[in-house]
């Protein structure tokens, strides 16, 4: 918390607000991180970890709900003005929402109402902890990106439920890290580079598999600027809640189009990794589009110790 407080103090000094993303990896948690067998909505094998995971008990589910509330309190202590709850991309809340990962036959699985139960409890806990002085934003999937996952029709119903719960805004994303990761990012994935930099010496077989059949394991999804725009507009038409756009925001024209289409804000990642001064250059008129090539070397070399060495290839 003290180190995060230094960060938020610096942000506030510049006149801006600070937000932090809160989430739980669920079945994508590495055993080396938690020191035990990872847990998720259902049991099974997760290739991303890679390990077998166990199904959460009801006590663990409710305890995790309480942990989200505690995390909000820590965020307040650290000086954050907003929390973003990650309910997409195949992390824990998403694992409960998606029929691809939720195979339960109790009140936490089955129909959509049951699959939303964990999410609803988490959001209520978060809203209670946030009180009136912190904003609550939720990142959701508009679609998971695979046949047995969530599709747009169910995702709109999930978004409407979050609107009823009183969250302040939704971030509209898509994709499933353990099954359809390139739906999130789009563009090329330098498989051999990713395998080389993976700090997973115990799982040499996974690194070898990535080198041999990585393109089948992580198929490329073509990149285009503002690639989620058409889908996000369907959500804009069905919801009254403030929406935040994400996905392929590299060109000034697209940024203006998004803001003029009823979105209150947009998020960027790779454009800022490529050039941390990108927004200032836009404002000064020095450029109108990020030079990011979407080679995704920033993803392939994201493992600890390598983060500062990829910018030259972005």
Where do the language-model regions lie?
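Flavin-dependent oxidoreductase catalytic cores
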Residues: 1-314
């Amino acid at each position: 918390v003290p180190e995060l407080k230094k960060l938020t103090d610096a942000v506030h000094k510049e006149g801006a607000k600070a937000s932090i993303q809160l989430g739980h990896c669920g079945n994508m948690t590495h055993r080396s991180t938690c020191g035990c067998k990872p847990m998720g909505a259902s049991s099974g094998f997760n290739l991303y970890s890679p390990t077998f995971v166990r199904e959460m008990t009801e006590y663990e589910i409710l305890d995790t709900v309480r942990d989200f509330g505690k995390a909000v309190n820590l965020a307040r202590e650290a000086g954050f003005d907003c929390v973003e709850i990650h309910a997409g991309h195949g992390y824990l809340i998403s694992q409960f929402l998606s029929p691809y990962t939720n195979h339960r036959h109790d009140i936490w699985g089955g129909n959509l109402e049951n699959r939303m139960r964990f999410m609803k409890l988490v959001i209520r806990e978060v809203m209670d902890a946030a009180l009136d002085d912190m904003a609550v934003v939720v990142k959701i999937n508009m679609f998971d990106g695979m046949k047995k996952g969530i599709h747009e029709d169910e995702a709109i119903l999930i978004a409407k439920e979050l609107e009823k719960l009183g969250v302040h805004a939704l971030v509209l994303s898509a994709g499933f890290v353990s099954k359809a990761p390139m739906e999130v990012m789009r563009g090329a994935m330098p498989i051999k580079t990713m395998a080389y930099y993976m700090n997973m010496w115990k799982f040499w077989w996974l690194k070898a598999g990535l080198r041999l059949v990585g393109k089948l394991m992580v198929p490329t999804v073509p990149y285009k600027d503002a690639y989620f725009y058409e889908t996000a507009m369907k959500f804009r038409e069905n919801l009254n809640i403030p929406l935040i756009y994400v996905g392929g925001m590299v060109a000034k024209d697209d940024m203006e189009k998004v803001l003029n289409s009823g979105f209150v804000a947009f998020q960027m990642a790779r454009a800022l990794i490529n050039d941390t001064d990108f927004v200032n250059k836009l404002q000064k008129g020095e450029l109108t589009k990020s030079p990011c090539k979407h080679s995704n070397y920033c993803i392939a070399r994201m493992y600890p110790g390598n983060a500062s060495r990829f910018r030259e290839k972005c």
